[in-house]
Design a protein with these regions (language model features):
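Lumenal/extracellular ectodomains and adaptor appendage modules
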Residues: 1-191
Length: 191
């Protein structure tokens, strides 16, 4: 049996313990999925004892803080405790993130005068907060598409979903600190 110990840390404004945070240990293996819960103490410490060691299993810890899921994959067989689970304060100020790079590739132009375009956008949150768009549609992470674009396909590591908005699409996801790629492709008629 294994012991998993870690610390819940709020990174907004410094590294402070997140007292009382409910932390979930996840174990995924061929025999199924098992969850266990622990509460972070006054020092942000959480501990799971009696964790079954299963060869080939995947492990992780997660917590929901201010409505946002934070998590980290772990390897309890490695001798590098404690696990650090970082959380951040939620804000709806879109200055928390920026577009750091954008590329447009015309991948193919075919006979019926149709282009296949691929756009790759790098979104970065360099702040110590998590951007949460709230209910205002104008606060969503929005992307414009050219007139006549069709067959949109969106791929990103950001959570949430892509929804259609006027003149393009938007992502409903929060943006935690870090860097994320948003890739989308579409077909476009040309003359």
């Amino acid at each position: 049996e294994l012991v998993v110990e870690g610390r819940a840390i709020n990174r907004t404004g410094g590294d402070t313990p997140e007292v009382g945070l409910v932390v979930t240990l996840h174990q995924e293996s061929v025999s199924g999925h098992v969850d266990a819960e622990a509460v972070a103490d006054i020092d942000g410490i959480f501990r799971f004892e009696g964790v079954e060691s299963i060869e080939g299993a995947s492990y992780g810890v997660s917590a929901i803080y201010q409505g946002i899921m934070y998590g980290v994959d772990i390897d309890p067989l490695q001798a590098e405790p404690p696990v650090e689970l970082f959380v951040f304060e939620a804000v709806d100020d879109d200055s928390a993130f920026s577009i750091e790079a954008a590329s447009l590739l015309i991948v193919q132009a075919d006979e019926p005068r149709t282009l296949w375009a691929l756009e790759i956008i790098t979104v970065a949150n360099r702040s110590d907060t998590t951007y949460v768009p709230g209910t205002d549609p104008m606060k969503l992470l929005r992307f414009a598409l050219p007139a006549g674009a069709r067959d949109l396909s969106v791929e990103t590591a950001l959570p949430g979903e892509a929804i259609q908005v006027d003149l393009g699409f938007a992502l409903t996801s929060e943006i935690q600190p870090g860097e994320y790629e948003v890739m989308f492709s579409y077909m476009l008629p040309y003359e």
